[in-house]
């Protein structure tokens, strides 16, 4: 479990990539990705990373993929990539522009349920896929309506609720000032 607050990745090979079962429960909050090398999207890359949150990511000429990569060849004795994530959430992400070859800022084809709630900006489309390996189709709500989504950030909402429930109102006030 890791929290990445405001990370930036530009001109990278898979600007962000999350791989494997040990890389589960991660939060990417207020990040920025742009211009991947050879159109290689940011992604959940291989071996079922579970229950991650991509929250308020700005996507510029890039795309974030949560897809079945069973067809991706393994190398050097590693198995094929397989289904890459399940129960991961994309929350209120903003698209500035689409990659030339892909008219969506998010592609989701997660094992079981995946969730995409709220997108915004001039590039707001989501591509959903579903196969026998990943059914049912992931949940999509608020495509293009993220500006009016409540709460604006799932991470911030859950952090506030947790701290207040634990009687840590002073801690929440200090944290909120830094957001």
What is the meaning of each model-derived region?
Residues 1-17, 22-38, 43, 48-61, ...:
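Right-handed parallel beta-helix
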Residues 91, 96-179:
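Long, contiguous C-terminal flanking segments immediately downstream of a protein's structured core
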